[in-house]
Amino acid sequence: MRLQVQIGTECVVVPCKPDDTIHAVAKKSVEKLRRLRPKLPLADDYFEVRRTVGNSLLDPEDLVSDVLKDSDFIIVAASVEETEDAKEAKKQEEIDNARAEIEKIDNRRRKVSFADSLAPMVLAPPTKLLILDGNSLLPEDLVRCEKGECAIQLSMESEDRIRKARTFLEKIASEHRAVYGVTTGFGTFSNVTIPPEKLKKLQLNLIRSHATGYGEPLAPNRARMLLALRINILAKGHSGISVENIKKMIAAFNAFCVSYVPQQGTVGCSGDLCPLAHLALGLLGEGKMWSPTTGWQPADVVLKKNNLEPLELGPKEGLALINGTQMVTALGAYTLERAHNIARQADVIAALSLDVLKGTTRAYDPDIHRIRPHRGQNLSALRLRALLHSEANPSQIAESHRNCTKVQDAYTLRCVPQVHGVVHDTIEFVREIITTEMNSATDNPLVFADREEIISGGNFHGEYPAKALDFLAIAVAELAQMSERRLERLVNKELSGLPTFLTPDGGLNSGFMTVQLCAASLVSENKVLCHPSSVDSIPTSCNQEDHVSMGGFAARKALTVVEHVEAVLAMELLAACQGIEFLKPLISTAPLHKIYQLVRSVAPPLNEDRYMKPEIDAVLEMIRENRIWEAVLPHLETLEAMEELDPDALRQFTKTPTGIVQDRSMIPISDDEESIE
């Protein structure tokens, strides 16, 4: 017969006879692993043997045939031959390796972070071509623009539409018909007729007068999203822009030349007038711009050094550049994608915390969620079933408390699908609104060349994205509320059974004490930021614009909420991994063990107090790079497919189906295998 033997994080298959003793099997297992892994500091001896199922202790004098069956899984806790110097050297090596990995993460982040970029820098060339047609742009496309991955180009159909609209508009202007913003003033001045010789001056004055924003500028990579989205709206062919000017805008985008755009100053109605005016101002050669070759410089200098021509405005073209909801929508699309990523990873992090806290998976039984068929709830429950203990995906930690008397867990563990689920559903609701807005003509007036009409309307009103982003902030904030409470359970000895603040020498060391305090402060800030911006309205423009959306702040604070949520979940993830140190040699399921290993690449176990912020930041950057999700995705896809074929596959205490997914370090070594790469 054969037994599968776990020693630390390694696994070996050991042949044995029915009349062998447990002691003989344990000795043989240690000898085999020492031969296959000569660098492991294993002693010749071991100190206990346990069955994986139930974590029950085995008597070394028992015969194998009396207590085990063929192919059973056992755990041998072996002694480690390490001097104190070797232990210290190992700790230092882990810290040094983590610092090197943190430096790599910082370097990746700097490549797309230009907030403080005053000097020239080298950027990687774009790897994708994005065709803009005004109808098919997606939020993830804008994020690719933000990362510098895309160059853009107009579709041929869009160019035709733009030409037709411009030809018709120039005809209207030449006939000097009374058309708002073409031959009249703006807002309260809409009753003022402008003489033909001043129509171009009217548009230039509009840009200059409306560029009155306040506050810190958008980072160049985010201003680039704003530019790409405005080009996409102009590509619909209802704005009246000329093909020549839109091609100049595309050339500026592809050269990574972007204007100085203050973040504050829009009320989200009549479009995002202030920020879009700043965007246009730089393209006219006024104000400031940024490019990789110049850093921040006067706009005319930046354009000249990049061989770009400034825009030359004809009738209505100034209004076409600034009348729209693109500031709210571009930031909203970016925030939406980050919310989508953190919501998925929140399911993974919650699963790891539940295993460390020795919670039960029974609350995720498919029948519970089938009779409350919210899509997000069922999706979250499925992920938790796939990540956590089942016969198909075993966790030694879960097996160790199979026979405990606990009936149910606290809400932040038991109700993860119900709370995370509504976040998933809210994100998809917001995605529909934002995607529609990204491909909508939001000018005023709008040019309908086929009808030969120019019609004034209200598509510039930002209520749709404003309300959606307020809703998004409210929903996503719940992820941090749940996470911070799980973090509290992890650091609280009375709730977790783990050492207080997850430190082995409390008193001398404070461990994760203030990590939880920081998380609590961010959750508290989010509660204030979740007050909806869009419930407010202050009339503007002499009461002509008497209801506004306040969407600009809705977008900015939604992004801040998401950033706080990412940070809180990074802290929970670090704490959950620290909790595992006190459960060793037991390990979690294969996908969750992979997350543990990923975190340990930048954050070694906290054996004594040290400066933790670089490690928190590194784990946070991993979350922002979506690496937690990407690490478990192959496992999720396989295990979820198993449940689709067999609804009982991921239930607790079920028969093991085929297709077990295991981390490479957990795959048993065959008798004739001499090494593991």
Swiss-Prot record:
Cysteines joined through disulfide linkages: none
EC number(s) per entry: 4.3.1.3
Post-translational modification: Contains an active site 4-methylidene-imidazol-5-one (MIO), which is formed autocatalytically by cyclization and dehydration of residues Cys-Ser-Gly.
An MF annotation (GO) of this entry: histidine ammonia-lyase activity
Key words, A-Z: Histidine metabolism, Lyase
Modification sites for 2,3-didehydroalanine (Ser): 270
Family: Belongs to the PAL/histidase family.
GO biological process: L-histidine catabolic process; L-histidine catabolic process to glutamate and formamide; L-histidine catabolic process to glutamate and formate
UniProt note: phenotype after gene disruption: Defective histidine metabolism resulting in elevated histidine levels and resistance to nickel and zinc toxicity. Additionally, slightly resistant to copper, slightly sensitive to cobalt and iron and substantially sensitive to manganese.
Top-level taxonomic group: Eukaryota
Cross-link (5-imidazolinone (Cys-Gly)): 269-271
Catalytic activity from the UniProt record: L-histidine = trans-urocanate + NH4(+)
Pathway(s) per entry: Amino-acid degradation; L-histidine degradation into L-glutamate; N-formimidoyl-L-glutamate from L-histidine: step 1/3
Pfam families noted in UniProt: Lyase_aromatic, Par3_HAL_N_term
Protein name: Histidine ammonia-lyase
Annotated PROSITE patterns: PAL_HISTIDASE (PS00488)
GO annotations of cellular component type: cytoplasm
Species whose genome carries this gene: Caenorhabditis elegans
Residue ranges the record marks as coiled coil: none
Enzyme type, top EC level: lyase
